[in-house]
Protein backbone atom coordinates (compact mmCIF):
# COMPACT_ATOMS: atom_id res chain seq x y z
CA UNK A 1 0.00 0.00 0.00
CA UNK A 2 2.84 2.37 0.82
CA UNK A 3 4.47 1.60 -2.52
CA UNK A 4 1.17 2.26 -4.29
CA UNK A 5 0.85 5.60 -2.51
CA UNK A 6 4.01 6.96 -4.16
CA UNK A 7 2.68 5.95 -7.60
CA UNK A 8 -0.11 8.52 -7.59
CA UNK A 9 1.44 10.58 -10.41
CA UNK A 10 3.52 8.63 -12.92
CA UNK A 11 6.36 10.58 -14.57
CA UNK A 12 5.58 12.24 -17.89
CA UNK A 13 7.31 11.28 -21.13
CA UNK A 14 9.18 14.59 -21.01
CA UNK A 15 10.53 13.67 -17.57
CA UNK A 16 11.73 10.27 -18.85
CA UNK A 17 13.32 11.99 -21.85
CA UNK A 18 15.13 14.50 -19.64
CA UNK A 19 17.05 11.65 -17.99
CA UNK A 20 18.51 10.54 -21.33
CA UNK A 21 22.02 11.68 -22.20
CA UNK A 22 21.87 12.64 -25.89
CA UNK A 23 19.53 10.87 -28.30
CA UNK A 24 17.11 8.16 -27.20
CA UNK A 25 18.55 4.77 -28.22
CA UNK A 26 15.96 2.37 -26.80
CA UNK A 27 12.37 3.40 -26.18
CA UNK A 28 9.20 1.72 -24.97
CA UNK A 29 5.93 3.52 -25.64
CA UNK A 30 2.58 2.79 -23.98
CA UNK A 31 3.32 -0.93 -23.75
CA UNK A 32 0.67 -3.32 -22.48
CA UNK A 33 2.24 -6.76 -22.07
CA UNK A 34 2.07 -9.91 -19.99
CA UNK A 35 1.74 -13.67 -20.02
CA UNK A 36 -1.16 -15.54 -21.59
CA UNK A 37 -4.11 -13.18 -21.28
CA UNK A 38 -2.83 -11.58 -18.08
CA UNK A 39 -1.62 -8.01 -18.51
CA UNK A 40 1.31 -7.14 -16.22
CA UNK A 41 2.56 -3.89 -17.75
CA UNK A 42 0.02 -1.11 -18.27
CA UNK A 43 0.79 1.65 -20.81
CA UNK A 44 4.43 1.32 -19.83
CA UNK A 45 7.07 3.69 -21.24
CA UNK A 46 10.87 3.83 -20.93
CA UNK A 47 13.72 5.89 -22.39
CA UNK A 48 17.48 5.27 -22.37
CA UNK A 49 20.38 6.66 -24.39
CA UNK A 50 23.19 4.70 -26.02
CA UNK A 51 25.87 3.76 -23.51
CA UNK A 52 23.67 4.55 -20.51
CA UNK A 53 22.54 2.22 -17.72
CA UNK A 54 19.08 1.96 -16.18
CA UNK A 55 18.08 0.00 -13.07
CA UNK A 56 14.51 -1.14 -12.37
CA UNK A 57 13.60 -1.54 -8.71
CA UNK A 58 10.33 -2.14 -6.89
CA UNK A 59 8.38 -4.68 -4.84
CA UNK A 60 8.02 -8.32 -5.89
CA UNK A 61 5.42 -8.71 -8.61
CA UNK A 62 5.74 -5.11 -9.79
CA UNK A 63 6.66 -6.18 -13.33
CA UNK A 64 10.40 -5.50 -13.35
CA UNK A 65 11.47 -8.73 -15.05
CA UNK A 66 8.44 -8.44 -17.35
CA UNK A 67 9.98 -5.26 -18.76
CA UNK A 68 13.14 -7.19 -19.69
CA UNK A 69 11.08 -10.14 -20.97
CA UNK A 70 9.02 -7.81 -23.16
CA UNK A 71 12.07 -6.10 -24.66
CA UNK A 72 13.54 -9.50 -25.55
CA UNK A 73 10.30 -11.08 -26.82
CA UNK A 74 9.32 -13.44 -24.01
CA UNK A 75 5.86 -11.92 -23.37
CA UNK A 76 2.59 -11.34 -25.16
CA UNK A 77 2.45 -7.76 -26.42
CA UNK A 78 -1.13 -6.47 -26.43
CA UNK A 79 -0.36 -2.91 -27.56
CA UNK A 80 2.42 -0.35 -27.65
CA UNK A 81 5.86 -0.39 -29.23
CA UNK A 82 9.56 -1.02 -28.55
CA UNK A 83 12.21 0.68 -30.68
CA UNK A 84 15.99 0.36 -30.80
CA UNK A 85 17.94 3.05 -32.65
CA UNK A 86 14.73 4.09 -34.41
CA UNK A 87 13.84 0.56 -35.56
CA UNK A 88 10.58 -1.00 -34.39
CA UNK A 89 11.51 -4.34 -32.80
CA UNK A 90 8.23 -4.97 -30.96
CA UNK A 91 7.26 -8.14 -32.83
CA UNK A 92 10.70 -9.63 -33.45
CA UNK A 93 11.43 -13.07 -31.99
CA UNK A 94 14.14 -13.39 -29.31
CA UNK A 95 16.63 -14.74 -31.86
CA UNK A 96 15.86 -11.81 -34.18
CA UNK A 97 16.21 -9.37 -31.28
CA UNK A 98 19.71 -10.76 -30.71
CA UNK A 99 20.89 -11.11 -34.31
CA UNK A 100 19.17 -8.09 -35.90
CA UNK A 101 18.70 -5.56 -33.08
CA UNK A 102 21.75 -6.39 -30.96
CA UNK A 103 19.82 -7.12 -27.77
CA UNK A 104 21.22 -9.80 -25.43
CA UNK A 105 19.48 -11.21 -22.36
CA UNK A 106 21.65 -12.34 -19.45
CA UNK A 107 19.66 -14.87 -17.46
CA UNK A 108 19.43 -15.16 -13.70
CA UNK A 109 21.68 -17.62 -11.87
CA UNK A 110 22.24 -21.25 -12.93
CA UNK A 111 22.31 -20.92 -16.72
CA UNK A 112 25.87 -22.31 -17.00
CA UNK A 113 26.26 -25.96 -18.04
CA UNK A 114 28.59 -27.37 -15.35
CA UNK A 115 29.74 -30.50 -17.24
CA UNK A 116 30.76 -28.53 -20.33
CA UNK A 117 34.05 -26.65 -20.47
CA UNK A 118 34.23 -22.90 -20.03
CA UNK A 119 35.02 -22.57 -23.74
CA UNK A 120 32.08 -24.76 -24.79
CA UNK A 121 29.75 -22.69 -22.62
CA UNK A 122 31.11 -19.53 -24.19
CA UNK A 123 30.73 -20.82 -27.76
CA UNK A 124 27.05 -21.54 -27.11
CA UNK A 125 26.57 -17.77 -27.03
CA UNK A 126 27.46 -17.64 -30.72
CA UNK A 127 24.85 -20.11 -31.93
CA UNK A 128 23.30 -17.47 -34.23
CA UNK A 129 26.59 -16.64 -35.96
CA UNK A 130 26.59 -17.56 -39.65
CA UNK A 131 29.87 -19.45 -39.36
CA UNK A 132 31.38 -21.31 -36.39
CA UNK A 133 34.69 -19.54 -37.04
CA UNK A 134 32.96 -16.21 -36.27
CA UNK A 135 31.80 -17.49 -32.88
CA UNK A 136 35.30 -18.81 -32.21
CA UNK A 137 36.85 -15.43 -33.02
CA UNK A 138 34.35 -13.61 -30.78
CA UNK A 139 35.05 -16.08 -27.96
CA UNK A 140 38.78 -15.41 -28.29
CA UNK A 141 38.10 -11.70 -27.85
CA UNK A 142 36.28 -12.51 -24.60
CA UNK A 143 39.21 -14.64 -23.41
CA UNK A 144 41.58 -11.76 -24.18
CA UNK A 145 39.41 -9.46 -22.08
CA UNK A 146 38.94 -11.80 -19.11
CA UNK A 147 42.07 -13.75 -18.14
CA UNK A 148 40.28 -15.54 -15.30
CA UNK A 149 38.13 -17.29 -17.92
CA UNK A 150 41.04 -17.85 -20.31
CA UNK A 151 42.99 -19.61 -17.56
CA UNK A 152 40.10 -22.07 -17.14
CA UNK A 153 38.95 -22.39 -20.74
CA UNK A 154 39.40 -26.19 -20.87
CA UNK A 155 38.05 -26.92 -17.40
CA UNK A 156 34.45 -27.88 -16.60
CA UNK A 157 32.40 -24.78 -15.80
CA UNK A 158 31.28 -26.51 -12.61
CA UNK A 159 34.65 -25.72 -10.98
CA UNK A 160 34.13 -21.96 -11.28
CA UNK A 161 33.31 -19.79 -8.27
CA UNK A 162 29.95 -18.04 -8.10
CA UNK A 163 31.44 -14.80 -9.37
CA UNK A 164 33.26 -16.56 -12.21
CA UNK A 165 30.05 -18.32 -13.26
CA UNK A 166 28.29 -14.96 -13.43
CA UNK A 167 31.21 -13.61 -15.48
CA UNK A 168 30.80 -16.58 -17.85
CA UNK A 169 27.06 -15.89 -18.18
CA UNK A 170 27.76 -12.26 -19.04
CA UNK A 171 30.61 -13.19 -21.40
CA UNK A 172 28.47 -15.74 -23.25
CA UNK A 173 26.10 -12.91 -24.17
CA UNK A 174 29.04 -10.84 -25.46
CA UNK A 175 29.91 -13.41 -28.13
CA UNK A 176 27.10 -12.01 -30.32
CA UNK A 177 28.59 -8.52 -29.81
CA UNK A 178 25.32 -6.93 -28.68
CA UNK A 179 24.64 -3.23 -28.20
CA UNK A 180 22.08 -3.70 -25.42
CA UNK A 181 22.46 -5.94 -22.36
CA UNK A 182 19.37 -6.94 -20.39
CA UNK A 183 20.64 -8.08 -17.00
CA UNK A 184 18.28 -9.91 -14.63
CA UNK A 185 19.36 -9.91 -10.96
CA UNK A 186 23.16 -9.90 -11.41
CA UNK A 187 23.80 -10.14 -7.66
CA UNK A 188 21.39 -12.97 -6.89
CA UNK A 189 22.96 -15.83 -4.93
CA UNK A 190 26.42 -14.22 -4.79
CA UNK A 191 28.69 -13.52 -1.84
CA UNK A 192 29.35 -9.77 -1.29
CA UNK A 193 32.91 -9.94 -2.70
CA UNK A 194 31.59 -11.44 -5.95
CA UNK A 195 28.78 -8.88 -6.16
CA UNK A 196 31.36 -6.09 -6.28
CA UNK A 197 33.28 -7.95 -8.99
CA UNK A 198 30.18 -8.40 -11.17
CA UNK A 199 29.23 -4.72 -10.93
CA UNK A 200 32.80 -3.73 -11.82
CA UNK A 201 32.52 -5.91 -14.94
CA UNK A 202 29.20 -4.32 -15.91
CA UNK A 203 30.61 -0.84 -15.29
CA UNK A 204 33.57 -1.65 -17.56
CA UNK A 205 31.22 -2.87 -20.31
CA UNK A 206 29.26 0.36 -20.12
CA UNK A 207 32.10 2.86 -19.72
CA UNK A 208 34.73 1.29 -21.99
CA UNK A 209 32.69 -0.74 -24.50
CA UNK A 210 29.68 1.58 -24.73
CA UNK A 211 27.09 -1.07 -23.91
CA UNK A 212 23.58 0.08 -23.05
CA UNK A 213 22.49 -1.76 -19.90
CA UNK A 214 18.97 -2.25 -18.54
CA UNK A 215 18.99 -4.11 -15.25
CA UNK A 216 16.63 -5.55 -12.67
CA UNK A 217 18.25 -5.69 -9.24
CA UNK A 218 16.73 -6.64 -5.87
CA UNK A 219 19.73 -5.06 -4.13
CA UNK A 220 18.31 -1.62 -4.85
CA UNK A 221 21.14 0.28 -3.19
CA UNK A 222 23.76 -1.47 -5.34
CA UNK A 223 21.73 -1.18 -8.52
CA UNK A 224 20.97 2.52 -8.13
CA UNK A 225 24.58 3.33 -7.19
CA UNK A 226 25.61 1.68 -10.48
CA UNK A 227 22.96 3.05 -12.83
CA UNK A 228 22.70 6.42 -14.55
CA UNK A 229 18.89 6.18 -14.41
CA UNK A 230 16.56 4.49 -11.93
CA UNK A 231 12.89 3.59 -12.32
CA UNK A 232 10.70 2.50 -9.41
CA UNK A 233 7.99 0.12 -10.64
CA UNK A 234 4.71 -0.43 -8.78
CA UNK A 235 1.91 -2.61 -10.18
CA UNK A 236 3.19 -2.60 -13.76
CA UNK A 237 3.75 1.15 -13.96
CA UNK A 238 6.65 3.51 -13.31
CA UNK A 239 5.98 5.37 -10.06
CA UNK A 240 9.22 7.37 -9.90
CA UNK A 241 11.99 7.99 -12.43
CA UNK A 242 15.18 9.89 -11.65
CA UNK A 243 18.94 9.71 -11.81
CA UNK A 244 20.22 6.68 -9.90
CA UNK A 245 22.04 8.74 -7.29
CA UNK A 246 19.00 10.99 -6.80
CA UNK A 247 16.80 7.96 -6.08
CA UNK A 248 19.31 6.85 -3.46
CA UNK A 249 18.65 10.15 -1.69
CA UNK A 250 14.84 10.01 -2.11
CA UNK A 251 13.30 9.44 1.35
CA UNK A 252 10.29 7.48 0.00
CA UNK A 253 12.56 5.17 -1.99
CA UNK A 254 14.90 4.81 0.97
CA UNK A 255 12.11 3.91 3.37
CA UNK A 256 10.50 1.34 1.09
CA UNK A 257 13.35 -0.25 -0.87
CA UNK A 258 16.72 0.54 0.70
Predicted regions and their residues:
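ABC-type ATPase nucleotide-binding domains, specifically the catalytic core motifs of the NBD
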Residues: 36, 76, 118-137, 145-147, ...
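Conserved ABC transporter NBD signature motif
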Residues: 80-88, 99-101, 134-139, 144, ...
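Helix-to-loop junction immediately C-terminal to a conserved catalytic motif
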Residues: 72
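Helical segment within the ABC ATPase nucleotide-binding domain
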Residues: 196-210
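ABC-family P-loop ATPase nucleotide-binding domain
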Residues: 1-32
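ABC ATPase C-loop
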Residues: 173-174
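The feature captures the beta-strand-to-loop junction immediately N-terminal to the Walker
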Residues: 57-59
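Conserved ABC ATPase signature
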Residues: 156-160
Amino acid sequence: KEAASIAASAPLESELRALVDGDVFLSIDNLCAGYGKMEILHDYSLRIGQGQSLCLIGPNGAGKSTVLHSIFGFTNIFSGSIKVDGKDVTRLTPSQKLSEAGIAYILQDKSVFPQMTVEENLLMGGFLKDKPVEAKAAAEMVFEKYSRLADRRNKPAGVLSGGERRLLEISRALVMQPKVLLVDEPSIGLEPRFIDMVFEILDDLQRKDGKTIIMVEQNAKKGLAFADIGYVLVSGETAIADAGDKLLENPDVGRLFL
